Regions:
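C-terminal non-catalytic interaction/assembly regions of soluble proteins
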Residues: 38, 311-490, 503
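Flexible, glycine/charged-enriched surface loops at secondary-structure junctions
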Residues: 116-119, 225-238, 283-301, 358-373, ...
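A conserved active-site cap/scaffold subdomain adjacent to cofactor or substrate pockets
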Residues: 209-308
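Gly-rich Lys/Arg/Thr-decorated short loops/hinges at beta-loop-alpha junctions or inter-strand turns
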Residues: 10-13, 49-65, 84, 126-155
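N-terminal amphipathic/basic leader segments beginning at the initiator methionine
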Residues: 4-5, 9-32
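Short, Gly/Pro- and small/polar-rich lid/capping loops
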Residues: 279, 283-305, 466-496
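Catalytic or ion-translocation cores adjacent to nucleophile or general acid/base/metal-coordination motifs
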Residues: 111-127, 192-233, 237
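Conserved phosphate/anionic-ligand binding catalytic regions in large, soluble enzymes, centered on
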Residues: 93-98, 177-194, 498-510
């Protein structure tokens, strides 16, 4: 990865803006991006891994026609007329578990507003109806972290969705769609697809696709690319009205990351690099359309709030698609207890023993977590400095074991145990435990479809089209020996920034 400074040059680009990094992001962001300056495509990512479970519960509680991100409909109302006038395309994964229903709702809104825009939707990601069939074909959905087959999880499967790629989006745009409603697609697909449409890229234009993959990866999480959640936050001039990111992508896959003028935040080599490291496990970033080699990138500061990224090499995509599976992992309950003064550990032990003796022992629970957080100080200057927290959490597939009775047993000890008892929150009723189960499925079983104007088109995964594999071979880099001499201690965070990324219950850290 090369860092530097670049003079701004004018080139033919497609300007792809982001207006959402998660379900619950700033509602006015779509209108802000459409009205704030010239863009060609408005995109939004709403689907964190566990969001699929939220949408599943929505379908269960409100009907089978639900299961999509309803707030996106408000955003469509806000921007549809302007997008029509400015010829701005909209591509989003807000379709969630029900892209067809969302497309129908959007068409109703457009009809009410007398706005003529073509709406396409994509499906084929839902693997739930096919799990048994795929098991019989040898697809075991082994957990990518634990290598355990799904059938051995001991949990009920709630949702199972393959991460689709970008070619369905390109197909929809090629056929004249103005709004493309996607289900579970890769976060970067909503950027790769429009770029491939703009420049007419072929399936094997791996370097260009890898560049768009990097661009999509950088802007998919909204303001994390423009100064939000940034380790060196003191560099950010203002956090008032932080601008959402825009990727200006060129025909060769090079791109510039920027934001609308007059907005807060910051676009710098640091903010872009931090987001590049987000949620990746290695420099070779796998995607169903291409493998992007992020260690080949060159990153240059073009001007204030403009960062140019180029040189990303690409390889043939893997023969598998990743699947996002969510399981019902039982129920949990717990409470935080505050301990003050002397003998903190003895107080925690006395309470823990009394509690589990009163409920019949720890063994009846599937999991028990007991943590004593020693935030107290030896010679405190205030009551707050004298406090420690005892956190007790229990989990069981049986909701009765971790229900209100467990909470009541904690409260029953309030006058019969350590001195100064009071709770810091939690308890009452049990909450569901959702287990994220990342897995792979052979791409030959992926059946993706684009629906527009009453016609349906099947999209074949690139890895199943018979192309010759093309893998980038990286030259080995010599690592200079560590410098020697006098040293001084300094906090790691003064020299290195970090960006954490989570996939359900799993997390990694890029430094």
């Amino acid at each position: 990865m090369v860092l530097g400074w670049r003079n701004e040059m004018s080139k033919d680009v497609i300007k792809i803006a982001n207006c959402s990094g998660y379900y619950g992001d700033k509602l006015s962001a779509a209108k802000d991006m459409v009205d704030g300056g010239p863009i060609d495509v408005l995109t939004g990512d709403y689907l964190a891994e566990l969001t699929m479970t939220i949408l599943f519960n929505q379908k269960m509680q409100r009907g089978e026609d639900k299961g999509y991100v309803g707030t996106f409909l408000k955003q469509v109302k806000d921007v549809a007329q302007s997008c029509k006038e400015k010829n701005i395309k909209i591509v989003t994964n807000a379709g969630g578990l029900n892209p067809s229903s969302m497309a129908m709702e959007i068409e109703k809104i457009l009809k009410e507003l007398s706005i003529n825009l073509k709406v396409a939707y994509i499906d084929g990601d839902d693997l739930m109806p096919r799990i048994s069939e795929l098991n019989n074909e040898g697809e075991l959905f082994n957990n990518m972290d634990k290598n355990i087959p799904l059938v051995d999880s001991g949990c009920q499967t709630l949702t199972a969705n393959a991460y689709l790629g970008a070619w369905g989006i390109k197909e929809a745009l090629d056929k004249g769609a103005d709004i493309v409603v996607c289900p579970r697609v890769t976060d970067a697909a909503v950027v790769i697809g429009p770029a491939a449409w703009k420049f007419g890229w072929e399936r094997t234009d791996y370097d260009a696709l890898a560049g768009a993959l990097a661009a999509g990866h950088i802007i998919e999480c909204g303001c994390q690319a423009t100064g939000g959640n940034y380790s060196f936050f003191k560099e950010v001039p203002s956090f008032d009205n932080v601008g959402y990111p825009i990727a200006e992508i060129e025909e060769d896959g090079s791109f510039t990351i920027t934001k609308h003028p007059g907005t807060g935040g910051l676009v710098s080599i640091g903010t872009v690099t931090a987001q590049l490291l987000y949620e990746i496990s290695s420099p070779a970033y796998l995607n169903p359309d291409v493998i992007g080699h992020f260690d080949t990138l060159s990153i240059e500061q073009e001007s204030d709030d403009r960062v140019f990224v180029s040189g990303c090499r690409g390889s043939s995509p893997p023969p598998t698609h990743k699947a996002c599976i969510n399981l019902a992992g039982g129920y949990r309950n717990g409470m935080d207890l505050v301990l003050t003064g002397l003998d903190i550990e003895e107080k925690a032990e006395a309470f823990t023993n009394a509690l589990f003796n009163s409920v019949g022992g720890k063994e009846q629970f599937d999991d028990v977590s007991i943590n004593l957080h020693r935030t107290d100080k030896e010679n405190p200057n205030s009551n707050e400095e004298a406090m420690a927290t005892l956190s007790i959490v229990v989990k069981s597939m049986n909701p009765d074991l971790v229900g209100r009775l467990f909470s009541a047993k904690i409260i029953e000890l309030s006058l019969a145990n350590y001195p100064g008892f009071f709770s810091g929150g939690g308890g009452k009723k049990p909450g569901p435990v959702i287990v994220y189960w990342p897995a792979l499925v052979d791409s030959k079983y992926i059946k993706e479809y684009v629906h527009l104007d009453g016609e349906t088109t099947e999209i074949i995964p690139t890895s199943q089209m018979g192309f010759k594999d093309n893998f980038y071979q990286k030259n080995l880099v010599e690592i200079a020996p560590a410098p020697k001499g006098e040293t001084q201690k300094s906090p790691l965070g003064t020299l290195y920034g970090a960006r954490s990324g989570d996939k359900g219950g799993c997390a990694n850290l890029g430094v």
